[in-house]
């Protein structure tokens, strides 16, 4: 009889615990649903970093502040030997690479603070000291490749073309010639010594699908910021428009 009482007591304990666990599970499920509904129905950030609910954008902004505070403009990304670079560089994204593009008429347009616009040919850019960088190119989708690029340091380019006042601004913006793709980049990142205006890949001229005649290579950022086929560059103290930030991605996208 005593053994039966013990068994009944144990069974009641298990039943009570199961009931409590069941209630907690459904409370958590309900709380998760309410949180999802709150996020889903929250207003969108309709600024230049739109395309995402405001609470999520605020979270990304906090991440951006942390990454910016930790960023050291003079710290170099790890580089590799040229023999480690892949021969077949992955092509990812063709927005802004208009097939009707006429390379023979292309000139880089640099819009200065005073309203003047510089128009610079590829041959003129190639007269500046050449810099090569071999690094682990990282895509925000999760893949990476060791790649080899050649061109002109952005900081050298800025000095050569008298952009001292522009370099005091907080951001640089870049567009493709057809203005279909565009990025905004914080000035410390674009002045980092490994950031180049790139005209070579694996020791040869850029292919069309990699942004010929000139693209941006910025090793401290994910691939979405490495704009292919630069048409124009401008400067601002406000965040420039950014294609993927407008579609819900992080604006800073550094790593």
Predicted feature descriptions by range:
Residues 1-14, 26-29:
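N-terminal secretory signal peptides
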């Amino acid at each position: 009889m005593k053994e039966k009482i013990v068994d009944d007591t144990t069974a009641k304990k298990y039943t009570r615990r199961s009931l409590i666990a069941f209630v907690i599970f459904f409370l958590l499920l309900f709380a998760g649903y309410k949180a999802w509904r709150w996020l889903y129905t929250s207003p969108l950030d309709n600024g230049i970093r739109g395309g995402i609910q405001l609470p999520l954008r605020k979270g990304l902004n906090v991440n951006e502040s942390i990454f910016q505070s930790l960023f050291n403009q003079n710290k170099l990304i790890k580089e590799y030997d040229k023999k480690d670079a892949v021969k077949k560089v992955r092509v990812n994204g063709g927005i802004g690479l208009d097939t009707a593009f006429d390379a023979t008429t292309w000139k880089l347009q640099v819009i200065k603070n005073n309203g003047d616009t510089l128009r610079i040919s590829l041959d003129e850019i190639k007269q500046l000291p050449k810099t090569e960088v071999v690094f682990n190119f990282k895509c925000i989708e999760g893949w990476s490749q060791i790649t080899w690029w050649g061109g002109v340091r952005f900081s050298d380019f800025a000095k050569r073309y008298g952009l001292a006042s522009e370099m005091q601004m907080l951001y640089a913006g870049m567009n493709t010639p057809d203005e279909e793709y565009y990025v905004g980049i914080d000035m410390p990142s674009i002045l980092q010594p490994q950031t180049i205006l790139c005209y070579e890949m694996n020791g040869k001229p850029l292919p069309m699908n990699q942004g010929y005649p000139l693209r941006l290579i910025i090793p401290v950022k994910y691939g979405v910021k490495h704009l292919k086929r630069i048409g124009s560059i401008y400067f601002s103290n406000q965040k420039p428009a950014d294609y993927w930030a407008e579609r819900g991605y992080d604006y800073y996208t550094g790593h």
